[in-house]
Amino acid sequence: DLVQFGQMILKVAGRSLPKSYGAYGCYCGWGGRGK
């Protein structure tokens, strides 16, 4: 769905950003999935 798609975009974008932003994106992705 759109939520999962958005999380996927965050993870992909995080890889091209500085490490601090990448880590933030990972936290958002994991937190959003509730795992």
Curated annotation (Swiss-Prot):
Under Enzyme Commission nomenclature, its number is 3.1.1.4
Tell me the Gene Ontology biological-process terms attached to this UniProt entry. arachidonate secretion; lipid catabolic process; phospholipid metabolic process
Quote the Gene3D superfamilies the UniProt record gives.
Phospholipase A2 domain (1.20.90.10)
Catalytic reaction annotation = a 1,2-diacyl-sn-glycero-3-phosphocholine + H2O = a 1-acyl-sn-glycero-3-phosphocholine + a fatty acid + H(+)
Keywords on record:
Calcium, Disulfide bond, Hydrolase, Lipid degradation, Lipid metabolism, Metal-binding, Neurotoxin, Presynaptic neurotoxin, Secreted, Toxin
- Cofactor mode of binding and number, as noted: Binds 1 Ca(2+) ion.
GO terms under cellular component = extracellular region
Q: Which Pfam families match?
A: Phospholip_A2_1
How would you summarize where this protein is expressed among tissues?
Expressed by the venom gland.
For this UniProt entry, which segments traverse the membrane? Answer: none
Coiled coil where? none
- Sites binding Ca(2+) sit at 27, 29, 31
| Cofactor(s) named in the record | Ca(2+)
Q: Where in the cell is it found?
A: Secreted
Q: Which GO terms describe its molecular function?
A: calcium ion binding; phospholipase A2 activity; toxin activity
According to the lineage, what is the superkingdom? Eukaryota
Query: What does the annotation say about its assembly with partners?
Result: Dimer.
Per the record, the similarity remark reads: Belongs to the phospholipase A2 family. Group II subfamily. D49 sub-subfamily.
What does this chain do? Snake venom phospholipase A2 (PLA2) that shows presynaptic neurotoxicity. 10 ug/ml of this protein produce complete neuromuscular blockade up to 80 minutes, without inhibiting the responses to acetylcholine (ACh) and potassium chloride (KCl). In addition, it produces a calcium-dependent blockade of acetylcholine release and causes appearance of giant miniature end-plate potentials. PLA2 catalyzes the calcium-dependent hydrolysis of the 2-acyl groups in 3-sn-phosphoglycerides.
Q: What is this protein called?
A: Phospholipase A2 neuwieditoxin-1
Q: Which organism is it from?
A: Bothrops pauloensis (Neuwied's lancehead)
